[in-house]
Amino acid sequence: MPNETTSVSKQGENVCFSIADAQDYQPADIGINPRGTSSKEKDFNFSPGLTIADGKLCIPPSFYHFPDEGQFVVEYLLISKKYDDAPRKFVVGVGVGYGKVYNFPLTDREIARPYGSIQVSE
């Protein structure tokens, strides 16, 4: 299953991720880790209690307080009752600085891309 990625924005104090074609998908787990954290050291919450509303998954500071600056890799799995055999995994590079949040490009080690989308030099 290739990973999806999406845009990040700040809405009030919340950090929000746009979810295209959200349907009835909801988060089953989420990991927010500083960029460069090894796979073994990543921390995941398997009952996040977060919901997708209006095509956005928003993380309030009461769930995770992003510091004033840094880069984070946010990973989450969305599941659907209607499409229970088609979970969706997202990996998003989130940068924080100067009171704003922004996307940064992920490396091939940070995200699994669909076969054929990786450019290979000949």
Per-segment meaning from a language model:
Residues 3-5, 18-20, 47, 54, ...:
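Short, flexible coil/linker segments at or flanking structured domains
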Residues 55-92:
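Extracytoplasmic/surface-exposed domains of secreted proteins
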Residues 1-38, 88-122:
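N-terminal non-catalytic regions of secreted/periplasmic and cell-surface proteins
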Residues 15, 42-44, 64, 70, ...:
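Short non-domain terminal segments
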Residues 8, 50, 80-82:
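Assembly/interface hotspot detector across virion components, adhesins/toxins, and nucleic-acid enzymes
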Residues 39-53:
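Solvent-exposed serine/threonine-rich low-complexity stretches and specific carbohydrate-binding patches
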Residues 10, 52, 65-69, 97:
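Surface-exposed coil/turn segments at beta-strand junctions on protein surfaces, enriched
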